[in-house]
Amino acid sequence: MPNTELRPILAIQEKEEITILNFFGPIAEKWWEDEKCFNEAEVAKAFAAVNPNKPIDIYINSPGGSVASALAINGILSRHKAGITIHVTGLAASAATLITSLKNAKTVISKGSLFMIHNPMSSAYGNAEELEKQIDVLNKCAESMRSIYMEKSGLDEKEIKSLMDAETWFTAEEAVE
């Protein structure tokens, strides 16, 4: 039976000179298992409480989840002008990498952490026309993802597409390169 209650795992800690946000777990509106998750609504609520003149440290350990939610979180966080440092503490995979690839942020990946990018996925059903529409949506999602990765990494579209097509895993050291 699906878990229809979102169980928040996003935490805020206000320090004198910095705000700390923890994003731990899958990114989803709801989760089908008994696992905690976070989404863009929670991030927007937390972000509204953040002092806009104070830098933010974000700690993330996430296997990914909803691309739409991760894109929204990227957009929400990109509005902060006082500086953001994102710390990958364990895993940033799939959609979570869209949060770690925030253009205006410094990204730090802890030794031993992993980073993984791949093409977006979907579970779809319907007739041929509906499935063709879903393919178009997936291609547009992949295009948006590539754009974010290119902006953050400086790699060109062909290189990013190749890495996504291969479902590429990086060590902390490889991801920084």
Q: What is each stretch, according to the model?
A:
Residues 1-97, 103-177:
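N-terminal organellar transit peptides
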